[in-house]
């Protein structure tokens, strides 16, 4: 899928606030790619994953239809299921990142956490504590 195609797909499912968050995450993730020189994926793959990172968790999009296998597996890894503890979810992303196939999900999660911390006007104490508690599991 092209970057334009991913934008169009995300615009169909995200509200304006979520789309703005997704764009910030995508841009940050693309920048972080420069730190990982052995990444077997292009910056565009990581950028698109950043855009799509909340599709399964926060929308009604049908899973397993839109993306190729590698993208789908990374997106599934980024999707926190409701019955999973947040710290366990973060720890799984970190553990899976040992395999270069899943490094894009790790990069996107780093960018996602950074964006949440950067939104000081909307970062509640509850969210701040949640993300701070999860950081040791991610880094």
Annotated model-derived regions:
Residues 1-139:
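Active-site helical microenvironments for divalent-metal-assisted chemistry
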């Amino acid at each position: 899928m092209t970057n334009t195609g991913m934008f169009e797909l995300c615009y169909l499912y995200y509200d304006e606030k979520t789309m703005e968050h997704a764009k910030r995450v995508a841009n940050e993730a693309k920048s972080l790619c420069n730190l990982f020189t052995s990444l077997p994926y292009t910056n565009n793959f990581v950028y698109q994953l950043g855009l799509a990172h909340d599709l399964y968790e926060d929308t009604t999009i049908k899973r397993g239809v839109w993306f190729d296998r590698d993208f789908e597996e990374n997106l599934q890894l980024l999707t926190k299921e409701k019955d999973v503890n947040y710290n366990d979810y973060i720890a799984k992303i970190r553990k899976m990142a040992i395999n270069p196939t899943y490094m894009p999900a790790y990069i996107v999660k780093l960018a996602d956490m950074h964006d949440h911390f950067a939104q000081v006007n909307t970062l509640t104490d509850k969210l701040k504590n949640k993300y701070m508690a999860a950081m040791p599991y991610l880094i």
